[in-house]
Amino acid sequence: MYTDSLFFAASTFIIPLFLERLTESEERAREFINTVLAAFLISMVFLVAITYVALPFLAPLYVPGFDTESQQMVTRMARILLISPFFLGLSGFFSSILQSFRQFFVYAASLVFYNVGIIIGIIVFVPQWGLPGLAWGVVLGSLLHMVIQAPSLVRTGFFPQLRLQR
């Protein structure tokens, strides 16, 4: 559900604006995706940093009946899971560009890879690392969700690039 929400938000915002700029020029379309990428990365770093620091204070509010050790586990798991929205956000961004070029199959396949990552977490990571292994499986799934789309995105010629300018 979280993945679908990210995808819907990204595609609702990005696809029409990207296509509008693409009709103007490829350069304008590239500028747009690079600007969106920069805004996304800055926002994510800011939000993740604040959340990471705040988690020990937030955990008792969300799991008030848990003992201290369990609350620490919740904090640890949540901190691991903070990586996942980064990959899923980039994946939603990638899929928006791909869908602009009417490439739908790769996004559909990416959902399978997301689940494969979670299954790997359950089968491989949990026996080795315990419950945090499940969180790492979710992170792996979100990474696979993004990475599977990258080759198709490169072929479009519109792979986003982060360029730092003065």
Model-derived features with residue positions:
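Membrane-embedded alpha-helical bundles of multi-pass transporters/translocases
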Residues: 1-166
